[in-house]
Swiss-Prot record:
Family matches, as InterPro entries: DUF423
Record keyword Transmembrane present: yes
Keywords noted in UniProt: Cell membrane, Membrane, Transmembrane, Transmembrane helix
A cellular component annotation (GO) from this entry: plasma membrane
Coiled coil: none
Bilayer topology term: Multi-pass membrane protein
Main localization category: membrane
Protein name: UPF0382 membrane protein SH2409
């Protein structure tokens, strides 16, 4: 599905931008702890953006389960990386409670991709 390729490309593009912003714009402004949080958000956004691109490439040849995998990964980026970006910038710790929701969405998305592979790929 072309949409997942676009969403994946946007996620990876934004992770390059947020990574550069963290390295140059936030240097010296955040503690080491919160810089680490920022970097984790950047890395997970990149990994799952690449996953979305892969899902976009293969989604036309498999089932609707692959589309579910794509949406779950995308929502995972929003919840996981989004909450970590906001946490790093605001240091409002309660936002860290949202992060595991994103992690669960990532796991569910990868699991859905595994299931669709077993189900529809010979």
């Amino acid at each position: 599905m072309k949409l997942f390729i676009i969403l994946g490309a946007l996620c990876t593009m934004m992770s390059v931008g947020t990574g550069a912003f963290g390295a140059h714009g936030l240097e010296g402004k955040l503690s080491d702890k919160y810089m680490s949080v920022w970097e984790k958000a950047v890395n997970y956004q990149m990994y799952h953006g690449l996953g979305l691109i892969i899902i976009g490439v293969i989604s036309g040849t498999t089932s609707i389960n692959v589309n579910w995998a794509g949406w779950l990964l995308f929502l995972g980026v929003v919840f996981f990386s989004g909450s970590l970006y906001i946490l790093a910038l605001t240091q409002i710790r309660i936002l860290g409670a949202i992060t595991p929701i994103g992690g669960l969405l990532f796991i569910a998305g990868w699991l859905m991709l595994i299931i669709s592979t077993f189900k529809f790929v010979g």
